[in-house]
């Protein structure tokens, strides 16, 4: 159905139970597991917002690693997740190593950085949602079903550094522990944002098992380009419109190694809701940690169409 219409899929048998007026709102077939399904909209008027954004609003109830960051409060970022790789230890036993962050944006889908899947010969096998302590024995890991890189991403470049991870199990409901973030779709003014991750708390330091957060300020791409020379392999065109930069003017706080794939977020209040968290960027690249050089993030609003089409198609 059109991008901002809500609807359902019906089997041919279910379609016959609809009234004539309801059938008028149906068009297009798809095949799922060899079963033909018919797409029908619920109403004739489009939603006020795009489907991906409206579904996020519907899911919310009305009314930490980062250089020099602070530990996030329990359940403060229920949309935060970690991607886990299966590794074999020297003694032959297997365990899970969490190496990249991700953000839950739907019942089965998460956003992360595409470059995360090139750190080793293997792909991640599980997702740990909810911003849990990575050493927790009570947290639940969810098996990964599919990884979808942006079709224009080319490693080791920094352009189009975005991917969607789909898990096998569907979250039937959101809770205060595990919930989704909304996907930002508008231009972003220069403002304060929050970076979240499990990376190193200082350059060349050890990673943190606790979720960390830090406040940064977005800057213009023009200012950001003053800190980065064009690199034929990584930044051949400099910092472009599909990227976002953020820094700490005190040169203390920053995203660091291990934060890759984690979100850059802003929070806004809208009518009827106490607070909505939006992912505006994905941690992609930086020079050192806490050096004063801005970090580079994938600008989410530039990929809204691709995210929506990938999830709902």
Residue spans for each PLM region:
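Sequence contexts marking disulfide-bonded cysteines in secreted/extracellular proteins
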Residues: 1, 25-31, 38-44, 53-59, ...
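Protease-domain processing segments flanking chymotrypsin-fold serine proteases, especially trypsin-like
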Residues: 1-111, 126
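Extracellular trypsin-like serine protease catalytic domains
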Residues: 9-11, 16-19, 82-95, 191-200, ...
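Extracellular/periplasmic catalytic domains that process cell-envelope and extracellular macromolecules
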Residues: 29-34, 71-76, 96, 104, ...
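Short, structured beta-strand segments at or near domain termini in extracellular proteins/domains
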Residues: 35-41, 163-166, 300-310
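Conserved H-D interstitial segment of serine endopeptidase catalytic domains
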Residues: 45-46, 61-64, 83-88, 110-113, ...
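Solvent-exposed loop/turn segments at secondary-structure junctions
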Residues: 116-118, 134, 154-156, 169-173, ...
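Active-site substrate-binding loop(s) of clan PA
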Residues: 148-154, 169-215
């Amino acid at each position: 159905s059109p991008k901002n219409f809500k609807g359902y899929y019906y089997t041919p048998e279910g379609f016959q139970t609809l009234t004539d007026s309801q059938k008028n709102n149906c068009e297009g077939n798809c095949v799922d597991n060899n079963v033909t399904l018919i797409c029908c909209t619920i109403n004739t008027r489009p939603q006020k917002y795009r489907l991906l954004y409206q579904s996020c609003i519907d899911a919310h109830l009305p009314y930490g690693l980062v250089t020099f960051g602070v530990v996030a409060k329990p359940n403060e970022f229920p949309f935060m997740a970690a991607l886990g790789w299966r590794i074999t230890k020297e003694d032959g036993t297997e365990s899970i190593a969490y190496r990249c962050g991700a953000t839950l944006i739907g019942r089965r889908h998460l956003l992360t950085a595409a470059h995360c899947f090139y750190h080793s010969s293997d792909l991640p096998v599980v997702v740990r949602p909810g911003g849990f302590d990575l050493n927790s024995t009570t947290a639940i890991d969810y098996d990964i079903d599919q990884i979808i890189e942006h079709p224009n991403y080319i490693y080791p470049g920094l352009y189009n550094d975005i991917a969607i991870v789909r898990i096998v199990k569907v979250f039937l409901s959101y809770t205060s522990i595990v919930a989704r973030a909304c996907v930002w779709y508008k231009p972003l003014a220069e403002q304060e944002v929050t970076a979240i991750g499990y990376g190193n708390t200082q350059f060349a330091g050890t990673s943190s098992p606790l979720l960390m957060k830090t406040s940064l300020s977005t800057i213009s791409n023009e200012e950001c380009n003053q800190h980065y020379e064009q690199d034929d392999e990584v930044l051949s065109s400099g910092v472009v419109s599909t990227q976002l930069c953020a820094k700490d003017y005190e040169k203390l706080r920053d995203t660091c190694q291990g934060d890759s794939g984690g979100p850059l977020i802003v929070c806004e209040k809208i009518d009827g809701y106490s607070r909505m968290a939006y992912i505006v960027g994905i941690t992609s690249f930086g020079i050192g940690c806490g050096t004063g050089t801005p970090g580079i993030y994938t600008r989410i609003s530039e990929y809204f169409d691709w995210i929506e089409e990938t999830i709902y198609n």
